[in-house]
A protein has these predicted regions:
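A structured, charge-rich N-terminal accessory region that forms the first stable segment of a protein
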Residues: 1-17, 22
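Short Gly/Ser/Thr- and Asp/Glu-enriched loop/turn motifs at secondary-structure junctions
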Residues: 26, 229-233, 266
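Right-hand nucleic-acid polymerase module
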Residues: 48, 52, 178-179, 184-194, ...
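Conserved polymerase palm-domain catalytic core
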Residues: 98-232, 237-247
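A common structural junction motif
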Residues: 130, 134, 253-261
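Compositionally biased, intrinsically disordered low-complexity segments enriched in Pro/Arg/Gln/His
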Residues: 395-399
Length: 410
């Protein structure tokens, strides 16, 4: 693609002028993420180029002002680390304003989120934002032409099902692996399901962060829940009483149903802030002094230990090189060590050394992490936790918006 960049770009432009551009469905392959099978789509370089242009120049600017600040996924300057900082700031804010850790948190997510986004409703939402924000008529016309073509590649072949079964799929939850391993002879293209978006394409990221915006507005504006945030399909809300959160959950479920989304009531839970709860694979609890105790999910440790042993087998068989192993481990440890105890960091480092006979190296920085990896803990026991600094003491009756001046609250 790079060798013929200018020529390929000219061909793409010509296809747009003549109306002959049609995106390719791409290459779909399965992965297993924490025990959950998922279908990932890899687009062609031509389609990636078009998607980047569409999202960077049109979609992202059009939807950004309609997203709440605590919507932390797939946006420039945000991400998992940003969302976790905001989440902890919300916990501190609650303690500062109420002077106690006696409260509750609602943790909720959607069931089969990406696979169950209805195309017609989603296009309607995107169309609303585009008409408001895109001033250039030609840009708007091209975008309105392009989006249905992209959604066409998201459609799933359901030719082997009856009309009644397809109707049930549109009304209920469908399996994202619906066509995985199915005989190609059964996928005739006679019937297509207009539901679900591909994981792996850039337009899907924009869709994922904006489509449930009405639920965010319901929580923030209608119910006035300041301590609310969302990361793709994982949402949280903090309130003083369980009843407030139950009422919020019922309202969110009604809004979600209107948009064809399914809230997972089995996984939705309301727990005390003083007890241990998990959000984005980190366990938290708010103490009576306002400190936040953070702890890595033990399953993450177990999973990474198994991965290291699998990497060792692959390395011995010559299927991967050491640099791949080292980079994978450094990536994992670099994003998790702040939520691990001294013992956990040291034990993971020791296992790595035992398997590979050397320790991972960074070109610069990570001095504190290097020390934890090289020195065993002197404490007799370890809770496997780290704690964030406590917020300032509450000063009623003057409200304090946040103990962390870095953040603002909408």
């Amino acid at each position: 693609f790079e060798m013929n960049h200018l020529l390929t770009t000219a061909h793409i432009r010509q296809d747009f002028i003549t109306g002959n551009y049609k995106p390719d469905p791409g290459n779909k392959f399965p992965i297993n993420e924490r025990g959950h099978p998922r279908y990932i789509t890899s687009n062609t370089m031509v389609d990636k180029t078009v998607n980047h242009l569409l999202c960077d120049e049109v979609l992202t600017p059009s939807i950004s002002k309609y997203l709440i600040y605590d919507n932390g996924a797939s946006q420039k300057g945000k991400g998992v680390a940003f969302h976790r900082r905001r989440f902890e700031a919300r916990l501190h804010q609650y303690f500062t304003q109420n002077g106690t850790n006696e409260g509750y948190i609602l943790l909720v997510d959607f069931s089969g989120y990406y696979a169950n986004i209805p195309h017609d409703k989603c296009l309607e939402v995107l169309q609303t934002f585009l008409e408001r924000e895109v001033e250039d008529p030609e840009t708007l016309a091209i975008t309105e032409m392009l989006l249905p073509l992209i959604f066409k590649t998201f459609e799933q072949d359901v030719s082997r099902f009856t009309d009644k079964e397809i109707e049930a799929m549109m009304a209920g939850k469908i399996d994202p692996m619906l066509n995985y391993g199915v005989d190609p002879a059964l996928l005739t293209g006679e019937k297509m399901l207009r539901k679900g978006v591909d994981i792996g394409s850039q337009p899907s990221q924009n869709i994922g962060i904006v489509y449930p915006y009405r639920l965010d507005n319901y929580a923030k504006i209608v119910k006035a829940v300041k301590g609310y945030g969302r990361y793709t399909d994982d949402s949280y809300a903090i309130a003083r009483t369980r009843e407030e959160l139950l009422e919020l959950l019922d309202g969110l479920e009604k809004e979600a149903k209107e948009y064809g989304l399914i809230i997972n009531r089995k996984k939705a839970r309301i727990v005390k802030l003083s007890s241990e709860f998990r959000h984005l694979q980190v366990c938290y609890s708010l103490t009576e002094t306002g400190r936040i105790i953070r702890k890595i999910n033990p399953k993450n440790i177990t999973r990474e230990r198994r991965k290291l042993k699998a990497y060792k087998r692959l390395l011995d068989s010559g299927r991967i090189d050491y640099a791949t192993v080292e980079n994978a481990f450094k990536s994992w440890l670099g994003s998790h060590w702040k939520y691990m105890s001294h013992d956990q960091v040291y034990n993971m480092s020791s296992l790595y050394y035992e398997l590979f006979g050397r320790r991972p190296k960074w070109k610069k920085g990570h001095g504190r992490l290097h020390w934890l990896m090289a020195h065993p803990s002197t404490a007799s026991t370890s809770m496997g936790t780290t704690t964030s600094a406590p917020p300032p003491s509450p000063r009623p009756p003057s409200p304090v918006s946040s103990p962390c001046p870095f953040f603002h609250f909408g």
